[in-house]
């Protein structure tokens, strides 16, 4: 799998991309478990300084004041959870804010980690398992018992870095597809943990990229929305194959088609720099 030249001298882990990652742990700062919040969280993997991208993008400012609140029914689930694949409309639907922090939510988080590990992922959002609520889980190590398991409820980006980094990404909702996406190198986030406690964290490098990928899912944005036309062309046939697979499985026309896509000016960051 090819990566951009600015990472050719990076350690092996930094060349392996999200959210399908080999099972190798990254050293992470701070003790951050499923139930404990903290103020900092960043990868300590050393790598060469990435080049500042010349890609221009519109800043998308997100306000969630009008977000609907999820009911208990919205967070009900059955195990085993199944990964929702493109172009299922669930991936584009609006996701509701979670206000109930109970045992069911903890069980959902456990189930999400289970399916994430079983599918060799390092990050997963609730809409990817058919639940349109603002919840994500990730572990840069991609292995139970290694790294740190992170749970973010109702996350919101407050600041992002000016430096943009191109990096190949994959997605569990797009099996076997990898392509370059440009994102900010670091972000500052406000969120709630699994107990409902509010906190702020700063993420950089790989954890920041995983977070931004999953945050996009909570906004109904898919990773190919952020690709240049040239990059998108390199995976167009694979996306069309997923559209055909959806039609054959459901008997319904695909809710969206990459061939009809107009270049989308999705923001590379949110909130204030």
Curated annotation (Swiss-Prot):
Cofactor remark from the record: Binds 1 Fe(2+) ion.
Control of this protein's activity: Inhibited by actinonin.
Entry GO terms, CC: chloroplast; chloroplast stroma; mitochondrion; plastid
Positions of Fe cation binding: 171, 213, 217
Basic and acidic residues: compositionally biased ranges: 246-261
Stored Gene3D superfamilies: Peptide deformylase (3.90.45.10)
Phenotype when the gene is knocked out: Albino.
Distribution of this protein across tissues and organs: Expressed in leaves and flowers.
Catalytic reactions on record: N-terminal N-formyl-L-methionyl-[peptide] + H2O = N-terminal L-methionyl-[peptide] + formate
Protein name: Peptide deformylase 1B, chloroplastic/mitochondrial
Organism for this UniProt entry: Arabidopsis thaliana
């Amino acid at each position: 799998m090819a990566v951009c030249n600015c990472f050719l001298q990076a350690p092996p882990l930094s060349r392996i991309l999200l959210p399908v990652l080999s099972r190798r742990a990254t050293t992470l700062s701070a003790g951050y478990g499923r139930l404990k919040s903290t103020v900092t969280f960043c990868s300590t993997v050393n790598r060469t300084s990435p080049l500042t991208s010349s890609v221009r993008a519109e800043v998308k400012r997100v306000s969630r004041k009008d977000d609907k609140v999820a009911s208990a029914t919205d967070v009900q689930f059955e195990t085993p959870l199944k990964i929702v694949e493109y172009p299922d409309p669930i991936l584009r639907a609006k996701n509701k804010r979670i206000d109930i922090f109970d045992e069911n939510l903890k069980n959902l988080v456990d189930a999400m980690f289970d399916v994430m590990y079983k599918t060799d992922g390092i990050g997963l959002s609730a809409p990817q398992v058919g639940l349109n609520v603002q919840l994500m889980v990730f572990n840069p190590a991609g292995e139970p018992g290694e790294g740190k398991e992170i749970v973010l409820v109702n996350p919101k980006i407050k600041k992002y870095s000016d430096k943009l980094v191109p990096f190949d990404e994959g997605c569990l909702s797009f099996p076997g597809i990898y392509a370059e996406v440009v994102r900010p190198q670091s972000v500052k986030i406000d969120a709630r943990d699994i107990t409902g406690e509010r906190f702020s964290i700063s993420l950089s490098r790989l954890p920041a990229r995983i977070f931004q990928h999953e945050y996009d899912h909570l906004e109904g944005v898919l990773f190919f929305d952020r690709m240049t036309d040239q990059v998108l062309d390199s995976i167009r046939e694979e996306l069309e194959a997923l559209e055909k697979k959806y039609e054959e499985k459901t008997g319904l026309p695909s809710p969206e088609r990459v061939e009809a896509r107009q270049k989308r000016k999705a923001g590379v960051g949110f909130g204030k720099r």
